[in-house]
Amino acid sequence: MKLQGAGLGYRRNLAEDFLQLPSNNAIQFIEVAPENWSKMGGMARYQFDQAAERFPLAVHGLSLSLGGQAPLDRELLRNTKALINQYNSSFFSEHLSYCECEGHLYDLLPMPFTEEAVKHVAQRIRDVQDFLGLQISLENTSYYLHSPTSTMNEVEFLNAIAQEADCGIHLDVNNIYVNGVNHGLLDPYIFLDQVDVKRVNYIHIAGHDEEHSAAQVVENSANESFNKVKGAYRHLPELLIDTHGEAVKGTVWDLLEYAYQRLPTIPPTLLERDFNFPPFAELYAEVEHIAQLQQKYAHTEVMSYAA
C-alpha cells in the first residue's frame, strides 16, 4: 500500500468510525504515535490492527527530543522500529524540539535557532536514521517563547538542519501560521517561499484556538491591552494556541493552498484532531477538502511512499 493523498490521524475515539468506512473513501492513510501504540493491547489494538490492514500507516513521534541534551531514548527507538516494521510503514517523522531536561517535560519546547543547534540536532537525526534504517522527516513545531540568542529565523533553521542531516521536511501548516501571528517574526507566506521545497515530503494541517480558555484581556495602567494566561501577562494583540481541538481555520486552508502551489509535488497531507471530537462526518468533510485541494493543485506527480 502507498502513503499518498489525504489522511486522518487514528485515535481510539474514532476507531469504530474508521472501521465503518466504505472501501472507496477520501481517507487514504492513517497516522499514529509510537509512544501511544507500541505497547497498546486489548480491544484498542485489535481495532487498530483492523484499520492498519485497510490503510497505509505513517508513524509520527512525539517525544524523541531531537533537540535535547540527554542521550537518545533507545527503548523508544526500538519500539518505534518494531512498530514501523510490524505494519510495513515507510514513513517516520519527529518534531524539531526537545522535551526532556533531567526528566520528561510533557511539552515540545524550542531551542535557539543557532548554528550550534543545527549541528547538534542534525547529528542526532543521523543517529536515528542509522538506527531505523530509513530517512526521517523533521516537523516544524509551534512555540511560544523565542530565544534572543537566535542567529537565524525559523525556516532558515529548519532548512539548515534538513540539509545537514539529509532528512525530509514535515511541514505543519498550522504551526507556521500560529508562530507567524504570535511572534510576528516571519510572515507565514515568506516561510513557504523560503522553505526547501525539494525536501518537503509530508504535511500536517490542524485547528487552533484563537484565545486560550484560560485567557482574559485586561488593561494596564497605560490602557494597553494584555492577554492574561494563567497569571502571566503577554503584550500581544492575540494569542493563538496550537490545540488540534478545533476545525481548520480559513486562513490556514489558504496557507495550505499556497503551499501546494509552491511545492513541486503534492505530499501526503494529514488532518490532525486530538480532542473535542465533532461528529465524524465533519472530520471526513475536512479530509475531503484536503483531497479536493490536492487534485486542484496536482500540477505535477503526486508524492507517495511504497509501504
Swiss-Prot record:
InterPro entries: MbnB/TglH/ChrH, Xyl_isomerase-like_sf. It holds the Pfam family MbnB_TglH_ChrH. It comes from the Bacteria. NCBIfam families: PRK05409.1. Belongs to the UPF0276 family. This is UPF0276 protein HI_1600. The lineage of its organism: Bacteria, Pseudomonadati, Pseudomonadota, Gammaproteobacteria, Pasteurellales.
